[in-house]
Design a protein with these regions (language model features):
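Phosphate-binding active sites in nucleotide-utilizing proteins
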Residues: 1
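Amide-donor transfer/coupling interface in amidating biosynthetic enzymes
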Residues: 5-135
Length: 135
């Protein structure tokens, strides 16, 4: 929706649901990340993700075959999307919308690093932001 309505990419689509997408903003990864774990670097000091994790890097787990198409990065950044998290090889792993209380997207799945006694901080932050929004 961001690509279509803010970036004006009327044909923006996800290759998982449309393998012939004209504007594949989410495209098939060259290597599947299903079951993978990697260190994700958080670059944007002051971003929500940086505040939530209070770290320059985190250990992240995945269950995906598709990811952000890097060829759209410049356009998204020009439209106030902050690319906040990257893999060690520079692939985008997380983003957030500037000036929004909690518009965050990640390629990794915070639920996969959560345990009964330790819920991933990004999930807790989302719950807290939701509660604040209801007030």
């Amino acid at each position: 929706e961001f690509a279509r309505n803010v970036c004006d990419l009327k044909s923006a689509d996800h290759q998982e649901t449309n393998q012939f997408a004209e504007e594949p903003v989410i495209s098939k990864l060259s290597c599947s990340l299903v079951g993978e774990t990697e260190i994700v670097n958080i670059h944007s000091v002051g971003s929500i993700m940086h505040k939530v994790y209070a770290a320059k890097s985190i250990l992240a787990k995945y269950h995906c075959n598709y990811g952000f198409n890097q060829s759209y990065a410049k356009l998204f950044v020009e439209n106030d999307l902050i690319l906040t998290a990257y893999s060690s090889d520079g692939a985008v792993r997380g983003f957030e919308l500037k000036e929004h209380p909690f518009f965050i997207g990640t390629l990794f799945q915070p639920a996969l690093t959560s345990e009964r006694d330790h819920i991933d901080p990004l999930i807790l932050s989302f719950v807290n932001a939701s509660e604040q929004h209801q007030k």
